[in-house]
Each structure stands twice: as structure tokens, then as C-alpha cells.
């Protein structure tokens, strides 16, 4: 059984000026999503809702460490009902590491150095999450 699930992406937007990194976690039951894909009344309970507190700890730990290592703008931790995270049988987050539609971020995403910093930020975030979980379960 998995302890956590991360889905790692490079984002895209209509505007080439969109930039930064963001982390999505499952929307809590009874609330609208903070992304435009989930608005409009989908307030259903999903499999991953039972991990709401753990999802929040994971999302914030990954986002804060990704920011430190990437040096990019903070788009925040947001809530969404993306299928890949809402069906996860464990704490889960979807990480957006930059925008391929932004010329500067596309250039960065093509470099091994930036991808290594992003990877290290995510690893540091997972380690921070594990520390938080171990403290919470003492």
C-alpha cells in the first residue's frame, strides 16, 4: 500500500504570462474547488476526502519546499477534484512545476539544473511531510 501519491506536471495556460508553481490537493467534501474545472456545484464526497488533513500537510510541505528550491512565483496550494488525486487511496497532491506556455519557464523546464532543483524541492517537501506526520502520531 502506498503512503502517499504525487502527480508531477508542467502546466499550460491560454496566456503566455501565466507563471509560477502550485500544488493541488483534493477539495474537502461540501466545498467548491478553487480551480475553474471544479466550480459549479460539484460538492461530492470523493474517496480521497478522508485524507483531508494529511492532504493539506502534504500540499503545504511540498509547495513551500518547491518554492525555496525553484525560486519561482507562488501560485499557492489550491483545492480541486482532479481524477488523479480524488481517487487516490492515500494522501495525494498534484504539483505544477511551471508553465510550458510561458517562454521563460519553458526554457527553465528544459534545463537539467532547474528540473533537479524542482525534484529536490519535492523530495524536501515529502521529507517535511513525513516529519509532520510522525509528530502528529506520537
What are these regions (language model features)?
Residues 1-138:
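Active-site-proximal helix/loop segments of hydrolytic enzymes
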Amino acid at each position: 500500500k502506498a503512503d502517499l501519491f504525487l502527480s508531477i506536471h508542467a502546466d499550460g495556460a491560454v496566456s503566455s504570462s501565466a507563471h509560477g508553481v502550485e500544488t493541488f490537493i483534493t477539495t474537502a467534501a461540501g466545498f467548491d474547488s478553487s480551480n475553474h474545472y471544479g466550480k459549479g456545484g460539484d460538492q461530492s464526497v470523493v474517496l480521497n476526502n478522508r485524507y483531508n488533513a494529511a492532504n493539506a500537510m502534504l500540499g503545504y510541505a511540498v509547495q513551500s519546499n518547491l518554492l525555496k528550491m525553484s525560486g519561482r512565483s507562488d501560485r499557492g496550494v489550491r483545492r480541486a477534484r482532479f481524477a488523479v488525486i480524488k481517487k487516490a487511496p492515500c494522501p495525494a497532491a498534484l504539483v505544477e512545476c511551471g508553465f510550458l506556455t510561458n517562454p521563460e519557464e519553458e526554457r527553465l523546464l528544459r534545463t537539467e539544473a532547474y528540473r533537479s532543483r524542482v525534484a529536490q524541492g519535492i523530495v524536501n517537501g515529502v521529507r517535511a511531510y513525513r516529519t509532520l506526520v510522525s509528530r502528529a502520531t506520537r
